[in-house]
Swiss-Prot record:
Annotated family: Belongs to the UPF0053 family.
GO MF term list: flavin adenine dinucleotide binding
Function recorded in the entry: Plays a role in the transport of magnesium and cobalt ions.
Keywords on record: CBS domain, Cobalt, Magnesium, Repeat, Transport
Pfam families: CBS, CorC_HlyC, NMB0537_N
NCBIfam families: PRK15094.1 (NF011675)
Gene that this sequence comes from: corC
GO cellular component terms attached to this protein's record: plasma membrane
Keyword Transport: yes
Protein name as it appears in the record: Magnesium and cobalt efflux protein CorC
Residue ranges annotated for the CBS domain, each copy included: 72-131, 137-194
Amino acid sequence: MSDNHLQNSDKINRKGFFSILLNQIFHDEPKNREELLVLIRDSEQNELIDQDTCDMLEGVMHIAKKRIKEIMIPRTQMITLKLHHNLNECLDVIIESAHSRFPVMSNDNNYVEGFLIAKDLLPFMKQSANIFCIKNILRPAVVVPESKHVDRMLKEFRSKRNHMAIVIDEFGAVSGLVTIEDILELIVGEIEDEYDDEETLNIRKIQKSTFSIRALTEIKEFNETFNTNFSDEEVDTIGGLVMKEFGHLPSRGESINIDGYSFKISIADSRKVIQIHVTIPENKTPVLIEA
């Protein structure tokens, strides 16, 4: 008997084995995606698989139908660096945001020049800051359309060993970014690391009377934390309140005093305020906040 015949026979046997196994578990083979999802849920209810496995299988099924636009981080929430940033400016943004990868925008903020990985700055820590040029250490930017399917994006991340991609709209303008973590969380649920608490906190204590505030923090949350009475009738967020008081879009380093509270812009770009440092009056005691 030829080797090819044996191999074909082996494939048939294996196919038959898995068909028998599938029938034993599911009784009837699913004919479409919806039936397969029902069988997966039935298997969990019958304790053939546990809840975590069920959730992961459902996650795998669902990502094939989703597009990048549905899961991306919108441009308004992207934390970026600029091509003209010096070493200290880069470090300030990295430390404040606790991220490890950053899109680097052109000076006019219209194009992504590449990605900067925080660890690539380490060699410059022992050298003169004057020799630093962000353009020399940029990684190529991966660019994908909003319409790309999530499962295909995951395959591309894996095959090319990338972790982040810039998302563009139908006109070629930057509309957001997507990371491999965003996709994996659709399958396995929230992925937490040692920095996640810092990244998700809207209000974080950094010194005795100074706090780092996300610009998107709602005024209501700020009032509850610091026992203040800032109005949210015209604006909803602390970033909106600060911009309203400035009367313009403030730049990094600008500060303003509002009712005894000092607001200093710590991260901003040409379109929005991202992070703010707030120094509270000495006689004020906020609700307990993690340092």
